[in-house]
Amino acid sequence: MSGVSTSTTTSFDHKQLAGRIAALAAGRAGLIMFAVALLTSASLLFSVQPLFAKMVLPHLGGSPSVWAVAMCFFQAALLAGYCYAHALNRFAPAWLAPIVHLVVCAAAALMLPFALPEWASEPSSGNTYLWLVSVLAVGVGLPFFATSANAPLLQAWFSRSGHPHASDPYFLYGASNLGSLVSLLSYPFLIEPMFGLDTQRAIWAIGFGMLMLMLGGCAVLMLSSQKSFAARGAATVADTAAKAITLRDRLVWIGLAFIPSALLVAFTTHITTDIASAPFLWVIPLATFLGTF
């Protein structure tokens, strides 16, 4: 009997060990998928900015104000994407948020590869800025909006995934920042010299398609976790506690965030006016700005 008991215990230990190894491997694979998705999303988000601005630049005679207006538009679109992600994370059920976002991404994919609108002929004098904002909104607005929401959404999905590190998903922000910096620094030195605009647009569209597949995989990992809905409840409690933050605190945060953004636009406009309006001078200040986060 003792031999049978020992054999049974050994078999159980082997199965338990195998289960733990499988769970560890699955957890690592899930972490890699979330990190790669965030890195890819950030790369697409920051490569499309100089790309589309360069597409528009010839229509405005190489004006240095093109990048300044484009930066303001992209920052506003980024804020809109974050607000959309916040609304999904806070109000939508855990199972519904990925569906809504994937539908938005699918609608954005229909606009790819992006191009200048057919009506975007040479702007009339006096309406240059309005023309530029309209072209940006129609030409690249929805793909940029959908991509900008991925960072907060993926971090929220990871926090509900049941992963051992799910309680602190903010380390994934490092993958996002890495993708942003690599994309910005590689654009003037590698992407722009090696590829024409048509090729860049095609590569971006392919990258967006791959990103959608990764988003679907991350959503499946999140929804398949038994802890998903428990994590959703914990997030709700955290949201309730966050309501103690005063309006004054929120206004101070907004004001402090406005200062570096305004300085970025002012400094970039200054150097592109005095030197040249080119992607190299566009991305270096923005990359420096991101590197200070």
Regions found by a protein language model. Name each.
Residues 2-293:
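Alpha-helical transmembrane segments of multi-pass membrane proteins
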